[in-house]
Design a protein with these regions (language model features):
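Key DNA-contact positions within bacterial/archaeal DNA-binding proteins
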Residues: 37
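Short, hydrophobic-biased segments on the C-terminal half of alpha helices
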Residues: 43-44
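A short, conserved structural fragment
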Residues: 47-55
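Basic, amphipathic "hinge/linker" alpha-helix immediately C-terminal to the N-terminal HTH DNA-binding motif
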Residues: 58-77
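Ordered, amphipathic secondary-structure segments that act as subunit-interaction surfaces
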Residues: 75-111
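Mid-protein regulatory/catalytic core that forms ligand/cofactor-binding pockets
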Residues: 104-171
Length: 171
């Protein structure tokens, strides 16, 4: 079983397209707000465990095992967000941090039951796709920057940024 810290690194690698491309330690350092030597050390541990591969001067990317494990973490996180909103009546700006804590602590059986309880949803409350069968492709990738002022759009995906969610909730 991986530590929370290692799982957070795997998610950071995937978030920075590390399923297809190499991600530099500098990018991970900035993304995670962690000093570069610490990133290098953790990447070494993840590589030794078989979750990532590294290439000198290119960076790190997820292996097949690393991607499988990372998608499982994301599935847990997104199901928890939905559960917290739909069942426990949390506000959507509150759920990300709660899910961050809980995603590392629930069993596979709990995830299966949660998925069933929620009727096998396709997306989390923020519009992020819930991975299934080791597949992960976001549905909503067009940004609002692609539209002109006055265009009528429906927002289907927002990032889990607390300040943004609070702002949107107030409108």
């Amino acid at each position: 079983m991986l530590t929370e810290e290692k799982e957070d690194y795997l998610k950071a690698i995937l978030t920075n397209n590390g399923d297809k491309n190499f991600v530099t330690n500098k990018i991970l350092s900035q993304f995670l707000n962690i000093k570069p030597p610490s990133v290098s050390e953790m990447v070494g541990r993840l590589e030794k465990a078989g979750y990532v591969e590294t290439k000198p001067y290119k960076g790190v990317r997820l292996t097949e095992d690393g991607l499988t494990h990372t998608l499982d973490i994301i599935k847990r996180h997104r199901l928890l967000e939905l559960f917290l909103i739909e069942i426990l009546k949390y506000n959507w700006e509150e759920v990300h941090q709660e899910a961050e804590i809980l995603e590392h602590r629930i069993s596979d059986l709990f995830v299966e039951r949660l998925d069933s309880l929620l009727n096998f949803p396709e997306t989390c409350p923020h519009g992020g796709v819930i991975p299934r069968n080791n597949e992960y492709k976001e549905k909503y990738i067009t940004t609002i920057l692609n539209y002109e002022p006055g265009d009528i759009v429906t927002i289907k995906r927002v990032r889990d940024k607390t300040d943004l969610l609070i702002y949107l909730s107030s409108k």
